[in-house]
Amino acid sequence: MNYLVTGCSRGVGLEICRVLLEQGHTVYGIARGFSNEFQQLQEENQEHLFFKSIDLSDSENVRKSIFKDFISNKLRLDGLVNNAAMAYDDIITNLNLEKLKAMYAVNVFTPMMITKYAIRNMLLHHTQGSIVHISSISAHTGYKGLAMYASSKGALEAFSKDTAREWGELGIRSNVVVPGFMETSMSSTLTDEQKDRIYKRTSLKQPTCIRSVAETVSFILSDKAGSITGQNIHVDSGTI
């Protein structure tokens, strides 16, 4: 199977690539930067892991930068993981429109455009493909300072549900995996006290395991999840 994964170079995106490679799939990864961890993974999987550096804030050039210069119509795409994201954290009264637009470009507009062309590829090859969007528990549980970021993930979740309804008749599935708080570069600026407050809101009193999220994504991409579409699957250490 051939899978496209955005935000592949670190964190949960890197782990998703690792899990898919372990299962014998071929992964086409895109991200702004190229991490040492991804480089090592690519060296270990030279024939099955490919990378292209792309500015994911440039939503208008998705077709050329990804689906012409990287993944052509000759390649059958079996699945897509929209994982790339950026955070814009602040309280609502400090909202900056330019920063909000920049975040929405990466978190909403580009994933929507990538989905558009991924579905076109699936239609061309008569593929019953699977699309997985990575959201955030912040879209479901209120956190101070995360209103803007949470709203972008909420938009992505609504888009996924309608995508599922629109294309399900042709066997194309769309789902969302909703991770809880994970120890990633996006959370590195939080203090231990802030992290402890987040942990206390979970049933397991611990961060969400990145590997668990990646394994869930792999399952949703697979035929084993063939009857699952239009859903939000929470992997969040029981944040209730």
Predicted feature residues:
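Residue(s) in the substrate-gating loop at a strand-loop-helix junction
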Residues: 136
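Active-site helix of classical SDR
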Residues: 115, 152, 160
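Conserved NAD(P)H cofactor-binding loop of Rossmann-fold oxidoreductase domains
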Residues: 83-88, 238
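Catalytic Tyr-X3-Lys loop
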Residues: 86, 93-113, 132, 156
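Alpha-helical segment proximal to the catalytic Tyr-Lys
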Residues: 120, 124, 165-169, 226
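Conserved mid-core segment of classical short-chain dehydrogenase/reductases
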Residues: 87-101, 145-148, 186-191
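Conserved glycine-rich cofactor-binding loop
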Residues: 9-10
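C-terminal substrate-recognition "lid" of short-chain dehydrogenase/reductases
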Residues: 206-235
